[in-house]
Amino acid sequence: MKKLLIGLFLVSSVLAFSERVVKGDKAYADDKGIVYVEGEKTPYTGVIEGYNAQGKLEGKATYKDGKMDGSSKLYYPSGKLQSEAIFKDNVQNGVQKDYFEDGKVKLELPYKNGKPEGTAKEFYPNGKLFVEATYKNGIKDGYEKSYYDTGALQSEKTIKNGKIDGVSKIYYPNGKLGSEATFKADVQVGVQKDYYESGKLKAEVPYKNGKADGVAKAYDETGKVIEQVTFKNGQQVK
């Protein structure tokens, strides 16, 4: 008898704490963003599921007292997981993960108090890192790097308050420097230098306030000047 009573208690506990599930077309949000189910006056607690015209699940989210609280997931038409995120009191926190349809991670984006915060990573379908960037208070700040699908560095730049600030570099697949330029608050300044894959200088173009300004030179791989053009405020001077 004791075992039977324990079993009944466990079953009743599971039922008591099982989540309620309603379809999205039965729910609505008021002007404060609080979610209710049609015909009910109490803010909704449970899971809301959204379906497409074909009746396939598109997404679902967990709510508590009318606010997103817990996991939120989106799905591909195939039913495979596309994206997942965590919310607390309608505010996104933790790492959002997006997936390719084969299940491999496509994006990892950390959130804090509803804004991106920390190092975000985007991946190629083969699992190699594609882009890596740092965020502060919802804005890119720090650095951004991109990679070839082989894993070799493709580009790197410094970012301050959402704008490129400092030296920006682009690399060949073999790792050799292809180009370097300087920016100040997203505006290109100084001399941009382009290189042959051998490492020899290919071109020099001076910039001022985001526009070519001064004498630009192109070189062959022996170092000989093969072209020289003068610019003023972005326009070629003839």
Where do the protein language model's features map onto the residues?
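Glycine/tyrosine- and acidic-biased, solvent-exposed loop/turn segments at the edges of beta-strands
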Residues: 14-238
